[in-house]
Amino acid sequence: MPSFDIVSKTDLAEVQNAIDGVLRELQNRFDFKGSKSTIERKENEITLHTEDKTKLSQLQEMVKGYFVRRKLDPGALDWGREENAAGGTLRQVVTVRQGIDQDLAKKIVKAVKDSKMKVQASIQGDELRITGKKIDDLQECIRLVKGLKIEQPLQYVNFRD
């Protein structure tokens, strides 16, 4: 029976390359000279430190820009709230989403079942498996999921006959 998986994975090596690009630009930009602006990554978290809101918003735009340049979807970033940090600086923690969370998986499964297509959707950990009798049904299901306007980037893998 034909099947495919819906996953949401972000290449962390490319994320690190994007962060390195932001760091290089931070060192060279005139408006950041002499400021206490830093960006660092630990696993799936990126931490932005800077002095004021305008610099923080510029830093956010730089991160988004470098994500696009590295062919990463900025929708994979979950922007935390801005917090006051030591020394009168601002801190923002950004999480890189990996995998499909349960709420989103349930939303996709519900949409597939409500469409009355001849496919079955099952949640397997942080990914979805869609199976059907015909490849055409699976392709129609992919079109349906793409049309759901989901912010998180999704990939369609393991397309099997």
UniProtKB/Swiss-Prot annotation:
Cellular-component GO terms for this entry: cytosol
Keyword field: Nucleotide-binding
InterPro entries, A to Z: DUF520 (IPR007551), UPF0234-like_C (IPR035571), UPF0234_N (IPR035570), YajQ-like_sf (IPR036183)
Disulphide linkage map: none
Keyword Nucleotide-binding: yes
Keyword check for Nucleotide-binding: yes
GO molecular function: nucleotide binding
Function per UniProt: Nucleotide-binding protein.
Family: Belongs to the YajQ family.
Record protein name field: Nucleotide-binding protein RC1_3464
